[in-house]
Regions:
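Alpha/beta-hydrolase superfamily serine-hydrolase fold, recognizing
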Residues: 2-291
Length: 291
């Protein structure tokens, strides 16, 4: 299926938010799947719309018939080196990224209602989960949530089987100490009461939308991902968990890999679990973005 790509921008609470729309050419049919709002990872402080985890995933899903909007949310400063950045960059800690994402979801809901699936990978999964929880608490409704090798707790769980530990440089960059530092850098001076949206793990998840959770096998963030699945199940949320055998963290950044293909196929199957939402051509063009 052919895909058209358009860069746009919307107004958010912290300034303009760049987005990229991937629209499948549907051959004249008005029966379209829910729109996926997708967030790249990068530890809250790096990443862009051009990295494969954003662009390749969006292209792959759009070719399956799912409209996708990727969000260039504002990035936090480098951990321990935030003083090197601009004053504006230093201020881009929580809740800025969540606010950027919610602005996109709210604008999109004006045209497609609740036919929205919010998702992301790694840090993007954490932002997506926090934004989904806040959107729900503010009266919004989503069709579902897509999460890939995410982490969801302010302090990373300590338990990890030896065979699941990361190798290579990630033994250090994804050590529990480094991950907790990354989280503290993202949270900044936000009050502890904000944690339920910054890091939704351990909070009240009652009524959380139906969720697909893809977990990397050898990943320092896996304990948090597994715990979050258990927390969703404990409150009766619908959650479908898949462990991608042999995978490492960020496998969606490698579009030529088997794990990438497996992950996208699982997403597509899960998105197709219900009948498509009916949408008109007017809906498709009514996102209301400005160049």
């Amino acid at each position: 299926m052919d895909v058209t790509v358009q860069d746009d921008e919307i107004d958010g609470p912290f300034g303009p938010v760049p987005v990229r729309r991937y629209s499948p050419v549907a051959g004249g049919s008005d029966a379209l799947a829910p729109t996926v709002v997708w967030l790249h990872g990068g530890g809250f402080f790096r990443g862009s719309l051009n990295q494969p985890e954003a662009d390749s995933v969006a292209h792959a899903l759009a070719r399956q018939g799912y409209p996708v909007v990727t969000v260039d949310y504002r990035l936090a400063p480098l951990p321990l080196l935030g003083w090197l950045g601009s004053r504006q960059k230093r201020s881009n800690r929580y809740p800025v990224a969540v606010g950027d994402v919610l602005a996109v979801v709210q604008r999109l809901s004006n045209s497609v209602g609740d036919a929205i699936v919010l998702g992301g990978a790694s840090a993007g999964a954490c932002i997506a989960a926090g934004a989904a929880l806040r959107y729900q608490d503010e009266g919004g409704k989503l069709s579902g949530v897509l999460l890939a090798y995410g982490f969801f707790h302010r302090t990373h769980p300590a338990t990890m089987e030896k065979g699941h530990r990361p190798r290579g440089h990630r033994r250090f960059t994804h050590s529990r100490w480094a991950l907790n530092l990354m989280n503290r850098n993202y949270l900044g001076r936000a009050p502890a009461s904000a944690d339920c949206y910054a890091f939704p793990g351990g909070g009240d998840l009652t009524g959380f939308p139906p969720t697909l959770h893809l977990i990397a096998e050898r990943d320092g963030m896996r304990p948090s991902a597994e715990l979050f699945v258990a927390e969703l199940e404990a409150v009766g949320s619908s959650v479908e968990r898949h462990l991608i055998s042999g995978s490492k963290h960020a496998f969606l950044n490698h579009p030529n890999g088997n794990e990438f293909a497996t992950g996208v196929e699982l997403m597509s199957q899960w998105l197709n679990r219900d009948a498509p939402h009916e949408r008109t051509h007017e809906d498709e063009s009514a996102f209301g973005l400005r160049l």
